[in-house]
């Protein structure tokens, strides 16, 4: 781990993050928010970690344990008291936090859409027959093959800059990147956003999750709470409940998004077969004033609808959940 940004004044908080440019940008956003919300009473020492997932640059996460590979080192340091806070991209966080840890804030969600990048095409439909798509995401692979089964898929791993470089080197004709990450890095213009209705994102995509221990003092918890954005917090609860019910990991193509429909929330979720040959979708709605418990029930109900429909085809859903 590496100290990136020493505290400038106020009570010191050790804020853990991955060391990629995107992760550091997110950590600085949270650190700045804490300084502002506490009027300088708290300051942050940003501590960067190289996680197991960062070290796996050539293979899919599914082959190395799935979710948690980008959070495990941070989780352990937080549990040992070496960190006060950990900042994560929510889509990388397992559906159940380690014992003794809680979410303290969900800042305003950035663009949740996936972005399409290619030097010769404006959309996946424009790619030539048999074109090569670079991705390490089972979800994106399945969704792309559902639209274009003729595409060839090669594994693309690495941070945003690495994947853009691989595309530039001609290792693939196209790739996908989260618009949230591109926007936070000031690179949104390099990609074409894909409508949510056409390509549902990963649960929690575009949301930052701030995690702390459950014994944190109430003063700090109140300050962190000021960083939260209520619609983003609501979406995080519903989408993660959907994911937890499905026992979601990197082993199954799963997508979910909570849509604002004016006077109600609508959760749409989907599971795809590997390769995208079959897609199962479910949806449900709840009132805007729904409690956290009702949001959890919404997520679980939509997941159960899919489990019932898909259990004959996908053995992972064959047991009762």
Swiss-Prot record:
Binds 1 dipyrromethane group covalently. One of its GO terms (biological process) is protoporphyrinogen IX biosynthetic process. Pathway: Porphyrin-containing compound metabolism; protoporphyrin-IX biosynthesis; coproporphyrinogen-III from 5-aminolevulinate: step 2/4. InterPro entries: HemC, Porphobilin_deaminase_cofac_BS, Porphobilin_deaminase_N, Porphobilinogen_deaminase_C, Porphobilinogen_deaminase_C_sf. The modification S-(dipyrrolylmethanemethyl)cysteine is found at residue 250. GO terms for cellular component: cytoplasm. Disulfide bonds: none annotated. Keywords: Porphyrin biosynthesis, Transferase. It is an enzyme of class 2 (transferase). It catalyses: 4 porphobilinogen + H2O = hydroxymethylbilane + 4 NH4(+). One of its GO terms (molecular function) is hydroxymethylbilane synthase activity. Its cofactor is dipyrromethane. Its EC number is 2.5.1.61. Pfam families: Porphobil_deam (PF01379), Porphobil_deamC (PF03900). Belongs to the HMBS family. Tetrapolymerization of the monopyrrole PBG into the hydroxymethylbilane pre-uroporphyrinogen in several discrete steps. The porphobilinogen subunits are added to the dipyrromethane group. Monomer. This is Porphobilinogen deaminase. It comes from Hyphomonas neptunium (strain ATCC 15444).
């Amino acid at each position: 781990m590496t100290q990136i940004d020493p505290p400038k004044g106020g009570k010191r908080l050790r804020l853990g993050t991955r060391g990629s440019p995107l992760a550091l940008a997110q950590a600085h956003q949270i650190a700045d928010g804490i300084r502002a919300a506490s009027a300088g009473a708290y300051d942050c020492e940003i501590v960067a970690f190289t996680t197991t997932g960062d070290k796996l640059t050539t293979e899919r996460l599914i082959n190395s344990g799935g979710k948690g590979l980008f959070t495990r080192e941070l989780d352990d340091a937080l549990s040992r008291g070496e960190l006060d806070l950990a900042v994560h991209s929510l889509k990388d966080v397992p559906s159940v936090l380690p014992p003794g840890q809680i979410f303290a804030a969900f800042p305003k969600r950035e663009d949740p859409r996936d972005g399409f990048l290619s030097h010769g095409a404006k959309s996946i439909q424009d790619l030539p027959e048999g074109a090569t798509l670079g991705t390490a995401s089972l979800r994106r692979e399945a969704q792309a093959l559902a639209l274009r089964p003729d595409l060839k898929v090669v594994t693309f791993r690495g941070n945003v800059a690495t994947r853009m470089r691989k595309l530039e080197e001609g290792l693939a004709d196209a790739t996908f990147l989260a618009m949230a990450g591109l926007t936070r890095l000031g690179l949104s213009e390099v990609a074409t956003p894909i409508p949510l209705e056409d390509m549902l994102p990963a649960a929690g995509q575009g949301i930052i999750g701030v995690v702390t221990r459950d014994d944190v003092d109430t003063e700090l918890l109140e300050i962190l709470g000021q960083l939260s954005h209520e619609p983003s917090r609501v979406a995080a609860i519903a989408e993660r409940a959907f994911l937890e019910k499905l026992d979601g990991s990197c082993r199954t193509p799963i997508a979910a998004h909570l849509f604002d429909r004016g006077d109600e929330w609508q959760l749409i979720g989907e599971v795809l077969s590997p390769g995208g040959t079959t897609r199962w979708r479910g949806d449900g709605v709840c009132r805007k004033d729904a409690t956290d418990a009702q949001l959890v029930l919404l997520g679980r109900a939509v997941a159960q609808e899919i489990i019932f429909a898909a259990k004959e085809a996908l053995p992972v859903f064959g047991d009762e959940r």
